[in-house]
């Protein structure tokens, strides 16, 4: 069996939580953590290696960009965090500069694996990661609407009493204010969502608003969101390293799906050892198609305005 190595850039709350989740859920041989604050990565490496007796042997170390050379995956969580009252798009200018300083040295190291991005605004930064790296589009992945979708399924579970494992519903579009729910195709416990009397139109509108605002509410209460997105990252890495063919709603490359080109946006996609092996284009109603087009247009406007 080949040696499995993950290179992590960003050791803040998302990065450190992801590192912990990864070691507990995926068998890897080496994890290298890179951050501008070297002292933190050194401390986390020492802390995380204590998991070995409980989860299995793994080399964990603080490193630099040269360590990305032989990694299977480069995970990017580094970036300015969203503060109360901010939208994810407010982070663009700052985080694009940070992203540029990360991608170049990773590519120069000889890295030939798969990029996985969670830094916000994730759809835009994933799009720019592909452009900056020149990597094939399937080799660049963003967490997209995987967290939004998890929040939607939790909310639907609360409303219906159905276990989240039996809820198949997606949030699509931007991981941000222009996201939307694909209610027409949603299935709850083998029945169409629309067949549930307790999920009338008014309730669904309230639920959609609650899902969209949940991240901001968490940030207002505790300063950041990190548990959910860290597990999203872990599941993506697991699918890549174990060739799982996992379907997740991700920042996926559009090559005509939904009428969108040259942009990463939230849509179900299949993750395998080769990265994104397929983008699943869901059937959308006329209204949902308009929402997807609007979401894409808003992000495309931002991307086109960035001078790389």
From Swiss-Prot:
Entry-linked NCBIfam families: L-LDH-NAD (TIGR01771), PRK00066.1 (NF000824)
Protein name listed in UniProt: L-lactate dehydrogenase 2
Domain of life, source organism: Bacteria
Keyword NAD tagged: yes
Residues that coordinate or bind NAD(+): 14, 35, 65, 79-80, 101, 143
One GO MF term: L-lactate dehydrogenase activity
Catalytic activity, reaction form: (S)-lactate + NAD(+) = pyruvate + NADH + H(+)
Job description of the protein: Catalyzes the conversion of lactate to pyruvate.
Subunit details: Homotetramer.
Matches recorded under PROSITE patterns: L_LDH (PS00064)
UniProt record similarity statement: Belongs to the LDH/MDH superfamily. LDH family.
Active site: 175
Coiled coil region boundaries: none
GO CC, alphabetical: cytoplasm
Signal peptide: none
Keywords, sorted A to Z: Cytoplasm, NAD, Oxidoreductase
Organism lineage string: Bacteria, Bacillati, Bacillota, Bacilli, Lactobacillales
Enzyme class: oxidoreductase
Compartments in which it is found: Cytoplasm
């Amino acid at each position: 069996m080949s040696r499995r190595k993950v290179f992590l850039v960003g050791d803040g709350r998302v990065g450190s939580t992801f590192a912990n989740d990864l070691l507990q859920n995926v068998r890897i041989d080496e994890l290298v953590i890179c951050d501008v604050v070297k002292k933190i990565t050194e401390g986390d490496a020492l802390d995380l290696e204590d998991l070995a007796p409980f989860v299995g042997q793994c080399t964990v170390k603080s490193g630099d960009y040269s360590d990305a050379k032989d990694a299977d995956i480069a995970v990017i969580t580094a970036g300015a965090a969203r503060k109360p009252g901010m939208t994810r798009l407010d982070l663009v200018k700052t985080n694009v500069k940070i992203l540029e300083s990360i991608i170049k040295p990773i590519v120069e190291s000889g890295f030939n694996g798969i990029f996985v991005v969670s830094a916000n605004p994730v759809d835009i930064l994933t799009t720019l990661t592909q452009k900056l790296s020149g990597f094939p589009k399937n080799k660049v992945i963003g967490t997209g609407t995987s967290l939004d979708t998890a929040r939607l399924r939790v909310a639907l579970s609360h409303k219906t009493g159905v276990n989240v494992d039996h809820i198949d519903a997606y949030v699509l579009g931007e991981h941000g204010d222009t996201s939307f729910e694909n209610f027409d195709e949603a299935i709850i416990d083998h029945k169409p969502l629309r067949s549930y009397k307790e999920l009338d139109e008014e309730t669904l509108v309230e639920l959609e608003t609650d899902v969209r605002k949940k991240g901001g509410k968490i940030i207002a209460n505790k300063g950041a969101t990190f548990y959910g997105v860290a597990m999203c990252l872990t599941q993506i890495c697991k699918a890549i390293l174990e060739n799982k063919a996992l379907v997740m709603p991700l920042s996926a490359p559009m090559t005509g799906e939904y009428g969108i080109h040259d942009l990463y946006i939230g849509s179900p996609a299949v993750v395998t050892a080769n990265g994104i092996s397929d983008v699943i284009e869901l059937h959308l109603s006329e209204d949902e198609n308009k929402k997807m087009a609007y979401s894409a247009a808003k992000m495309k406007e931002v991307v086109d305005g960035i001078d790389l």
